[in-house]
Amino acid sequence: MNQKKEAIYDARELGVPKMLLLGLQHMFAMFGATILVPILVNTYFNGEGLSIQVTLICAGIGTLFFHLCTKLKVPAFLGSSFAFLGGFHTVANLDTGIFKDMSMGEKLPYACGGIVVAGALYLVLALVVKLVGVKRVMRFLPPVVTGPIIICIGLSLAPSAVNNAKTNWILAIIAFAVIVIFNIWGKGMFKIIPILMGVVISYVVAFILFKCGVHNPDGSAIFTFKAVKDAGWVDLPPFQLCKFNITSILVMAPIALATMMEHIGDISAISATTGNNFIKDPGLHRTQIGDGLATAFAAAFGGPANTTYGENTGVLELSRVYDPRVVRLAAVYAILLSFSPKVAECIGSLPASIIGGVSFMLYGMISAIGVRNVVENKVDFTKSRNLIVAAVILVSGLGFGNGITFTVAGTSITLTSLAIAAILGIALNAILPGKDYEFDE
């Protein structure tokens, strides 16, 4: 019962049907967060914001771009980035210059144009990494920095898990319990798809309760199927081309400095999970190129910025299937769903409480990976400098809940708490004497 599951690096040995199910599991893990970004942006733009269909197809194609750039080696899914929400909100509220008489829908392409430039900044960093060498770059990112950052990635998501779960604790607990049961006691295929089983079984329970007239504790309905009924079966995603303006560029592009730090943390987490050093091979410059191209492509056609997803790192840890082919299947599913508004809305109808129950496990797993990263690399916490670096990262990553917002050229720029933690951690590690870690090339 307590034996560690053997890692699977080639899912083809499981057979096609099982691979398809594993891809479905990754898709469910990313779906809620991916479609939440356009939902939130729509509130900023009074219903004239991002399209869920465009978001899904851009996430799918962006993920495939990323895999091509990384030699098909890194099992990462790229979904919608939350880091740019503050930028979208700022652009929506611009009312000077060319934005003075614009409708909300007319402002959106300019926000996307700023994200295209942000994607280009990733390519600049990739060039720097390639020119100076990853070893020199990684001198600033030892385990005493990346480990606590990974811990913060998971813990910073924890409030989201609790907020979703508390809408109906019964369903959340069922989803969580099913995942634990299948992960610990499951046999064969069921042992490597615990999240998918948690989603399916809790969804069935929720639907039965819904049909029996049971409501959430706050009186709201467990399901809302109006959007499903109104959606068509097949429709093309409503693409729109981005536009450029220096004001919106100054709002959106600097956010890339924050998301680049998060990217390094995510790639470190995936490396720690799979036991493969992806910062070394295929290289940090390649992962940055993949993320940058995916972000620029998505925004060019009216989608949100893409980013490597921590949720899918949690899936990797639970299933112990590390084959990137499975993640590419999830990308294909996302692309297919983008052409069917009705199916997308059906999956989107998944109760928030179930998402919360699943997230309890996934987000905790991410933080546990960070702890493991520190332990396996034998970080010496008897040294005061290591304690200080880790302490500042943890407090900053969890303490600056909404980040820090400051004004540049009359526009607001927000550094997320994770970006602040990464910047402070990297700076302290560089300044304080007594470094005891060498990156292995």
Name each model feature, range by range.
Residues 1-76, 86-105:
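N-terminal signal-anchor module of multipass membrane proteins
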Residues 1-21, 214-238, 272-276, 287, ...:
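Intrinsically disordered, low-complexity non-transmembrane regions of multi-pass membrane transporters
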Residues 42-67, 254-324:
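Membrane-embedded helical hairpins/re-entrant loop segments and their flanking transmembrane helices
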Residues 49-50, 72-84, 137-146, 191-197, ...:
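Short, non-helical or kinked segments that cap or interrupt transmembrane helices
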Residues 88-93, 183, 312-327, 333-337:
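Interfacial segments of multi-pass membrane proteins
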Residues 103-213, 331-441:
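Membrane-embedded alpha-helical modules
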